Structure formats: C-alpha cells, structure tokens
Swiss-Prot record:
GO terms for biological process: isopentenyl diphosphate biosynthetic process, methylerythritol 4-phosphate pathway; terpenoid biosynthetic process. Transmembrane segments: none annotated. This is 2-C-methyl-D-erythritol 2,4-cyclodiphosphate synthase. Involved in the biosynthesis of isopentenyl diphosphate (IPP) and dimethylallyl diphosphate (DMAPP), two major building blocks of isoprenoid compounds. Catalyzes the conversion of 4-diphosphocytidyl-2-C-methyl-D-erythritol 2-phosphate (CDP-ME2P) to 2-C-methyl-D-erythritol 2,4-cyclodiphosphate (ME-CPP) with a corresponding release of cytidine 5-monophosphate (CMP). A divalent metal cation binds at residues 8, 10, 42. PANTHER family: 2-C-METHYL-D-ERYTHRITOL 2,4-CYCLODIPHOSPHATE SYNTHASE, CHLOROPLASTIC (PTHR43181:SF1). Belongs to the IspF family. It comes from Pectobacterium carotovorum subsp. carotovorum (strain PC1). Signal peptide: none annotated. Its EC number is 4.6.1.12. 4-CDP-2-C-methyl-D-erythritol 2-phosphate binds at residues 8-10, 34-35, 56-58, 61-65, 100-106, 132-135, 139, 142. Binds 1 divalent metal cation per subunit. It comes from the Bacteria. The lineage of its organism: Bacteria, Pseudomonadati, Pseudomonadota, Gammaproteobacteria, Enterobacterales.
Length: 165
C-alpha cells in the first residue's frame, strides 16, 4: 500500500467558470490558473502521483507549456491515472477536503464523487468528498480563493491488499 497527499489553492478572479471536482458551479467568479483551476482535481492528481512516486502535477503538466493553457483538469487526471495504472496500481480509497467560505459545496458533492469515480475507474464507495470553511479566517475565510487537500491510498493490482466488502 502507498499513501499520497495533495494540496492545491487558487485565487478567485476573472470571468471564467468556477469548476470544482469537474462540476461547473454557478458563482460570480472563476479561479485564476493556467488550466481550468479545478483545485479538487489538482489536489487529487498530486495525491495519486505522490503515492505512485511519479512526481507532481506541475512536473507532468507544466504551466510553462502552452498545450495545458485552459486545460480540462479531468483530462489531466485521466492521463495521470493511466500512468499510475501502467505501474500496476489501483485505488484503495480517496478522501478529499475542500476548504472554501463560498460558494457552498454540499449541493455539488454527489456529482464530484461521480466524476472522480468515473475518471479513476472505481466505485463511488472508494471516493469521499467533503467541504469545510475556515470560519471566516485566512484567505479562504475572506473569500479570496479556494483550497483543497486530498489523501489517496494505492494498492498493487493482484496483491490481495484490497478488501471486497
């Protein structure tokens, strides 16, 4: 078993859509980023890459490469997951925490879980997404941006490490 941790943060700004966990969320602003700024998918990608010892999202998809300008983060996650699968890993489980004062994430979490399970070719029971605030403290509490943390457990395929419930 291998554990990876991912973290991402983006500042609000611009007129682009707000995309979190692959879901377009109605809001007054998007997030400033080279790609679509999806903090959930970026943190998840980093957690998975870290667990597989494949570096990080910036190494795989550098923001200096124009090919990734405005990139759909679901596509980036799928490509990272393909490489992780090639190393013989499958997902044990994934736990995601979104840190945002606004907008409220609860109505969108079920679809985020669906998107992650689809992209990672796993069951929804293997994916947890939750959200919290910082009680109006810090940059997220002031509504300046959104942060996300993710923890992923990978297991080698065929090792019997996965428990079937």
């Amino acid at each position: 078993m291998r554990i990876g941790h991912g973290f991402d943060v983006h500042k609000f700004g611009g007129e682009g859509p707000l995309v979190i966990g692959g879901v377009r969320i109605p809001y007054t602003q998007g997030l400033l980023a080279h790609s679509d700024g999806d903090v959930v998918l970026h943190a998840v990608t980093d957690a998975l890459l870290g667990a597989a010892a494949l570096g990080d999202i910036g190494k795989l998809f550098p923001d200096t490469d124009p090919a990734f300008k405005g990139a759909d983060s679901r596509g980036l996650l799928r490509e990272a997951w393909r490489r992780i699968n090639e190393k013989g890993y499958q997902l044990g489980n994934l736990d995601v925490t979104i840190i945002a004062q606004a907008p409220k994430m609860a109505p969108h979490i079920p679809q985020m879980r669906v998107n992650l399970a689809e992209d990672l070719l796993c069951h929804m029971d293997d994916v947890n997404v939750k959200a919290t605030t910082t009680e109006q403290l810090g940059f997220t509490g002031r509504g300046e941006g959104i942060a996300c943390e993710a923890v992923a457990l990978l297991v080698k395929k065929g090792t019997g490490e996965i428990v079937a419930w």
